[in-house]
């Protein structure tokens, strides 16, 4: 599970930051999932090492322009390139109307299947490896956060030990790898769990934007390996945050702390905190770390490899930039 930030600015792009989009690359499935698709997202993908041909799912949090204005352009380009098999899009009520209207008035025809799923709180997608759930956030319009949970899997199978026990290879190995108990032809009963290493705990990612501090975000982020949370405002601008129903750095950090996450990655920063201003982005990072030390500030094209629990969890962010 590798996260790439394609846009980390709120509202409008800046010279250094595009508007909201986050890519989740799943190498084991050769799939690419997007979370939000602000204007210019396809340009950001082209500037990265991501493969648009692997795009299979897009999750939209809400229908504000800085989160959806890049959607139609990306979908249309995928059709012209002819290298996308199918795209499933998940989002709030009204998303399908937006796509249908835009395609009708622009005479855009897609050469591949697109399925729009109107989401409600709960499980919205599941396969043999992942479960995706969504929950309501607290914003000016209906907004959803998303949680991607990788399923636990059996530990590494000890083939050498199986050979020592003279267990015949083949279908039985598959059963033992899954931790099943198998009776051999000679009558021996083999417990697969005894031939496997420790269970590999599935990784969890939560994506919460746009929102003010709310229980819904805490619930989605519970015990996550990484929480991506908006931090539009500095703490001293909390009055504006309450008026516009956006989060401050301290709200993002409090969410991470309450949810017991392992890493907080802040995004969706107001352009008002540009270098040279009274408050700069580095100040926002210090505010959050005062509450939740394991915080980093995302920047465009930053990648983060979500570590497995058996690996070190504090050394997976590429070099920082604010």
Curated annotation (Swiss-Prot):
PANTHER family: ZINC PHOSPHODIESTERASE ELAC PROTEIN 1. It comes from Nostoc sp. (strain PCC 7120 / SAG 25.82 / UTEX 2576). It catalyses: Endonucleolytic cleavage of RNA, removing extra 3' nucleotides from tRNA precursor, generating 3' termini of tRNAs. A 3'-hydroxy group is left at the tRNA terminus and a 5'-phosphoryl group is left at the trailer molecule. Binds 2 Zn(2+) ions. Keywords: Endonuclease, Hydrolase, Metal-binding, Nuclease, tRNA processing, Zinc. Zn(2+) 2 binds at residues 66-67, 210, 268. Its cofactor is Zn(2+). The active site is at residue 66. It comes from the Bacteria. Homodimer. Belongs to the RNase Z family. HAMAP family: RNase_Z_BN (MF_01818). Zinc phosphodiesterase, which displays some tRNA 3'-processing endonuclease activity. Probably involved in tRNA maturation, by removing a 3'-trailer from precursor tRNA. One of its GO terms (molecular function) is zinc ion binding. Zn(2+) 1 binds at residues 62, 64, 139, 210. Its EC number is 3.1.26.11. This is Ribonuclease Z.
């Amino acid at each position: 599970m590798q996260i790439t930030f394609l846009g980390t600015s709120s509202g409008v792009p800046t010279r250094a930051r595009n508007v909201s989009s986050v890519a989740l690359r799943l190498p084991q499935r050769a799939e690419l999932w997007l979370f939000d698709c602000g204007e210019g997202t396809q340009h950001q993908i082209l500037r990265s090492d991501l493969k648009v041909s692997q795009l299979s799912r897009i999750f939209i949090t809400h229908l504000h322009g800085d989160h959806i204005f890049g959607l139609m352009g990306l979908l249309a380009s995928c059709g012209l390139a002819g290298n996308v098999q199918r795209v499933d899009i998940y989002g709030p009520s009204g998303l399908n109307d937006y796509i249908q209207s835009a395609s009708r008035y622009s005479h855009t025809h897609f050469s591949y299947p697109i399925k729009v799923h109107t989401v409600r709180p709960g499980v919205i997608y599941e396969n043999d490896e992942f479960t995706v759930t969504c929950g309501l956030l607290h914003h000016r319009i209906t907004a959803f956060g998303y949680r991607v949970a990788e399923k636990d899997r059996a530990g590494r199978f000890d083939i050498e030990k199986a050979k020592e026990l003279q267990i015949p290879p083949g279908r039985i190995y598959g059963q033992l790898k899954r931790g099943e108990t198998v009776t051999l032809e000679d009558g021996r009963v083999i417990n697969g769990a005894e031939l496997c290493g420790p269970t590999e705990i599935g990784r969890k990612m939560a994506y919460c934007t746009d929102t003010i501090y709310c229980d819904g975000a805490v619930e989605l982020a519970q015990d996550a390996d990484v929480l991506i949370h908006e931090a539009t405002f500095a703490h001293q601008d909390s009055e504006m945050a309450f008026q516009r129903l956006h989060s401050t750095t301290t709200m993002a950090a409090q969410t991470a702390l309450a949810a017991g996450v392992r890493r907080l990655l802040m995004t969706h920063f107001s352009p008002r905190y540009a270098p040279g201003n009274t408050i700069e982005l580095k100040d926002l990072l210090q505010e959050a770390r005062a509450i939740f030390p394991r915080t980093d500030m995302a920047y465009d094209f930053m990648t983060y490899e979500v570590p497995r629990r058996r690996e070190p969890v504090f050394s997976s962010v590429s070099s920082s930039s604010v």
